[in-house]
Design a protein with these regions (language model features):
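Short segments within alpha-helical structural elements
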Residues: 128-129, 136, 190-215, 353-408
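Sec/SRP-type N-terminal targeting helices
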Residues: 55-59, 72, 102-129, 154, ...
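A small-residue-enriched
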Residues: 45-103, 240-307, 311, 317-318, ...
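Amphipathic alpha-helical coiled-coil segments and their boundaries
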Residues: 43, 50, 57, 100, ...
């Protein structure tokens, strides 16, 4: 933001301008006084209830779990009927009924594999839920920041309008040049565009939250954040706790169990397959009937099946190790970022609380030590510093949201 105004001689107008600037600055102060309520919990709970995306994930998980339990029963029974008429009369009639079944060990292991796959499906649903709620929380954090910016820019826009109107009046009375009026008008246009840009971003964030909420409109006018929690003192121990509680890692661990149970199923598929049934053959003069038994020995069909299953286990374990490494590195980066941002915020707030530059600038201006142009430029620097503080507050909340996403 840039304020570019030349000196103004109209004392009444100067007082109104300075008064407007003081109101603008005082409005910024509350932006960083946080509430102690659960700031986004209500919105996140509502999104969890209304989200069509989560509903789709839920239905998909149910279908997947049903599919995992499909095919665990024995094969269908087989019935054969034959009628063979003779060349010289008479006919032979055949009948056969048989039931094939796998070795009992295979059914047991298939059932355990299906149970493990169903647990994995539930954990995947929890992981997807965490990702969706984290996205919603990020939108809320960005929305608070843009709400605060909109409040700040609205005040500054009022000031820009007052300055532009004052210059227009002075120009009509011959006390200002057209160039000075154009500068004031350009400053007003810049502030209008900044406010429109922020309001557009706010509408986009609200639209995104509404979509995440299943089409139900979301309203949030907060302009401040909750106080932040203290970072853990023992980072390494905390990373282990975070990993243990993170549903994404629970899903990866379960995928390893699924792969291991797949090895057991593959081994059991190398066991013989049996069939039992009834067979009958009848002619006009004679009839034969009795029980028939069969066995199928899988000599070639399951070749490399166990080897493939073991490779799946190795791949799942490697994926887990890679995810653990990336997660730890990401958390360490976010942890250090939070520490640095917290220090930056403390330094900003300490300077603002102790120095009260707005009052010092005002006294210097009213005492004749600063021209209005110098006063406005100094005040602009003060506003820009507050914007940086707001951005730092936002960045800290975004980093913390990702750090503690596993708690959602």
């Amino acid at each position: 933001m840039r304020i570019r105004i030349n000196n103004i001689k109209d004392n009444a107008m100067i007082r109104r301008t300075v008064s407007c600037l003081a109101m603008c600055l005082s409005a910024v102060m509350p932006l960083f006084a946080g509430n102690t309520d659960g700031q986004f919990r209500k919105i996140l709970d509502e999104i969890e209830r209304n989200s069509t995306t989560l509903a789709v994930y839920g239905k998909s998980t149910e279908a997947q779990k049903i599919g995992n339990r499909t095919g665990l029963a024995p094969e269908n029974p087989e019935i054969e009927l034959g009628y063979l008429p003779g060349i010289h009369g008479g006919a032979r009639k055949d009948i056969g009924i048989s039931q094939s079944f796998d070795f009992p060990t295979l059914y047991s292991r298939k059932g355990k594999l299906a149970d493990a796959q169903n647990v994995s499906a539930d954990l995947q649903l929890r992981s997807r839920r965490m990702d969706l709620l984290l996205e919603a929380e990020r939108c809320c954090i960005e929305l608070v920041f843009n709400n605060a910016l909109a409040a700040l820019y609205s005040r500054q826009l009022d000031n820009a309008k007052a300055v532009a109107d004052a210059y227009e009046r002075k120009f009509r009375h011959g006390d200002a040049t057209r160039i000075e009026c154009n500068k004031a008008a350009l400053n007003l246009t810049n502030m209008e565009n900044e406010l429109k840009k922020v309001n557009l971003e706010r509408r986009q964030l609200l639209s995104r939250l509404t979509m995440l909420n299943g089409g139900v409109p979301v309203e949030m006018a907060d302009t401040s954040y909750n106080p932040v929690r203290q970072l853990p003192s023992d980072f390494r121990a905390w990373v282990l706790e975070a990993e243990a509680a993170n549903p994404a890692f629970a899903y990866l661990r379960q995928e390893i169990e699924v792969a291991k149970k797949g090895v057991g199923v593959s081994k059991a598929m190398g066991l013989p397959k049996f069939s039992v049934g009834y067979a009958g053959e009848f002619t006009p003069d004679e009839g034969w009937q009795g029980v028939k038994l069969g066995v199928s020995i899988p000599l070639w069909e399951n070749r490399n099946r166990v080897k493939h299953a073991r490779a799946e286990v190795a791949a799942a374990e490697q994926a887990m190790d890679d995810a653990r490494l990336q997660y730890s590195a990401r958390l360490e980066f976010l942890f250090e970022q939070c520490r640095e941002l917290t220090g930056n915020i403390s330094r900003y707030e300490s300077v603002f609380e102790k120095n009260s530059n707005d009052e010092l600038l005002y006294r210097a201006f009213t005492g004749g030590e600063l021209s209005l142009l110098d006063y406005l430029l100094e005040l602009e620097y003060y506003f820009n510093s507050y914007e940086k503080l707001m951005q730092t507050q936002r960045d800290l909340r975004l980093a913390l949201a990702e750090l503690y996403a596993y708690e959602l």
